[in-house]
Amino acid sequence: MKRNIQIEALNQIPLEKQRIELVERKCLGHPDSIADGIAESISQALCREYLKEFGAVLHHNTDQGEVVAGESCPKFGGGKMIRPIYVLIDGRATKQFNGVTIPTDTVAVEAAHEYLHKILPELNLQRDVMIDSRLGTGSTDLRDVFKPRQGKVPRSNDTSFGVGHAPFSDVETIIRNTSEYIDTKLRKKYPAIGQDIKIMGLRDGNTITLTVACAIVDRYCADIREYQEYMGLLTEEIGKVAKKSTKRKVVVNLNTADDIKSKSVFLTVTGTSAEMGDDGSVGRGNRCNGLITPNRPMSMEATSGKNPINHIGKIYNLLSTQIAQESIKKVDGIEEMYVRLLSQIGKPIDQPLVASVQVLPRKGVTLQEINGEIQAIVDDNLANVTSITEKVIRGELKTF
């Protein structure tokens, strides 16, 4: 069946030429991102368990988790946790199939423990966190929609949509690169740099201002003087990363709420504000491209934790982003591209109600010149939509 792919030209000012642009990222140790990461790690673990036992992924959604802040007493040289962080795992998972009981709660708790150990090495998992799994079972009608049919494309679990865009702007690129640099390189040299980092980017004309909140781990920081040295180091390193991706002026402001005189600063025991006063929820942070982009169309769906078989809130957000990025790479003449995929509940996921593509051609290029190439890329990605499922299960696609 021919797919309903609609491609239209946009008539608007390109984002890079607009006066104001805002971009945000909540890094791995932010409470909202912790919730996202736990939810996704549980979904992946359930997928592996189902595949091992039954050769197929069974119905589940773990996209409703909460991180409830604990209480701590940080101090230079090393503080302590007073009350543990509470993690609530809820959602739905198939617990019995063909007479076999699946230990879904055990799988979920183990996955959460493993994920927290990986991203928050300063957190004592035996003492400083409580993990409570309250997974239920799904509604009968949605489980019926989910039922795999041999050789058939899965049917949409909902009437919903996914959104993606490309290419990334200077500010978007800077924030993604800064987060990756700190997580993969800088923290290895300086373990005092905590995992709870929030980066807010403002571009006002040709000036980019990065406002960064970064937790410092108290046991690796002796006093307020050393804390200030870390602030100077981070400001310098972030500035270096930023300037690799733009010719614009870059200003870095770090931990702007600090009061150095009274020593009231962003100091933590574990590297995350979830240890005291900051709760987290799945879906309240980054979109599947790792960013929050109010200048762009966005879906409000939580991508993390949703099943990767037929949950449109996951599949179409990932797929629309993939389509936009692939089109930018392969088709010359695209300034900006936005993709929106809309499903109908119960219909095959490779047949969206509409695949809407909005293109801002570069100067001197008409939509007619590039329409055919874009159409082919969209159609091919929809025909191979189940590849998204495989990539998600293997952990190859990020969801936040």
Swiss-Prot record:
Protein's pathway: Amino-acid biosynthesis; S-adenosyl-L-methionine biosynthesis; S-adenosyl-L-methionine from L-methionine: step 1/1
InterPro entries found in the cross-reference section: AdoMet_synthase_2_family, AdoMet_synthase_3, S-AdoMet_synthetase_arc
Entry EC number(s): 2.5.1.6
Cofactor(s) this protein cannot do without: Mg(2+)
Alphabetical UniProt keywords: ATP-binding, Magnesium, Nucleotide-binding, One-carbon metabolism, Transferase
Biological process according to GO: one-carbon metabolic process; S-adenosylmethionine biosynthetic process
Catalytic activity: L-methionine + ATP + H2O = S-adenosyl-L-methionine + phosphate + diphosphate
Source taxon at top rank: Archaea
Record carries keyword Transport: no
GO molecular function list: ATP binding; magnesium ion binding; methionine adenosyltransferase activity
Mitochondrion among keywords: no
Binding site for ATP: G136, T137, G138, S139, T140, D141
Signal peptide positions on this chain: none
Family, per entry: Belongs to the AdoMet synthase 2 family.
Function according to Swiss-Prot or TrEMBL: Catalyzes the formation of S-adenosylmethionine from methionine and ATP.
UniProt name for this protein: S-adenosylmethionine synthase
